[in-house]
């Protein structure tokens, strides 16, 4: 809550470098998987190949993909710190005044999880490192949509590797109007 108040109380110029992010995060496959919602804050950063840093909260549950009814069990909470490379543009769509960009980037995330009634052998708490190549679409200075898919490495009392799917929306905190 304090972080949200801090972000909203910053001057307009500082807010142009930040954005809100929301989306879906889940592991893929049969058996027990994680399905969660993400909400967080991203900020432009210039640190070598890392162009964007993100801090995200993840809230969800364990879901048995083999169950037809009643497959949810327990809850998870995760705190994720991520670094994103710059967008490698593949195509520009639209006009000069209303353009959209399609591109790829790479995201590396570290997540600390706690959970209740975990069916995973990692126990609770546990950690994860995720490497996510992603496809992004949208206004470079506005709302963007991203689809990320890659491996996540769980570690705790045991280790495991699972496929990870992320669907993300980003919206800037403030937008400067273009001047003629």
Q: Model regions: which residues?
A:
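Bacterial N-terminal signal peptides
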Residues: 1-9
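Short glycine/proline- and aromatic-enriched beta-strand/turn motifs that initiate or cap beta-hairpins
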Residues: 8-69, 168-180
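Outer-membrane beta-barrel domain signature
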Residues: 13, 25-32, 66-72, 117-123, ...
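Generic structural motif
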Residues: 16-22, 56-57, 104-108, 145-149
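Intrinsically disordered, low-complexity regulatory regions of eukaryotic regulatory proteins
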Residues: 33-36, 103, 107, 158, ...
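Gram-negative (and chloroplast) outer-membrane scaffold detector with strong preference
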Residues: 38-126, 132
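Predominantly the C-terminal beta-signal and adjacent terminal strand-loop region
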Residues: 50-53, 63, 126-180
